[in-house]
Amino acid sequence: MRHYEIILLIHPDQSEQVPAMLERYKGMIVAGGGQVHRVEDWGRRQLAYLINKLAKAHYLCLNIEADQAVMAELEHAFKFNDAVLRHLTVQKKKAETGASSMMKTVEREEARKASQAEFAASNER
């Protein structure tokens, strides 16, 4: 089996359906004998250019180990799901389980927003 990294751009109006989509895709991988090594929800982010007249999308990153039959099934599911705006699958040499640089950026942004909110709350007193 080979290792893959999959990036999904989901329609921003479908953000509530993301957990159900993830479970469905993870179920397809496990049912095919594969493994899910890492799942990251990067949240709603600005796009570099408009896709279907949308300026934002919900980003997901999956690191998996699967065979070609499972990958073909996943690619087919991505193509025929209207909520998936774009998908990118990259073959990797080994499984990556640590936090990606994008996830570290997301965590830094969340920490910065929390500290700003805390600072604003302390100044109101």
From Swiss-Prot:
Gene3D superfamilies: 3.30.70.60. GO terms for molecular function: small ribosomal subunit rRNA binding; structural constituent of ribosome. Residues 94-125 are annotated as: Disordered. One of its GO terms (cellular component) is cytosolic small ribosomal subunit. It holds the Pfam family Ribosomal_S6. GO terms for biological process: translation. Transmembrane segments: none annotated. This is Small ribosomal subunit protein bS6. It comes from Acidovorax ebreus (strain TPSY).
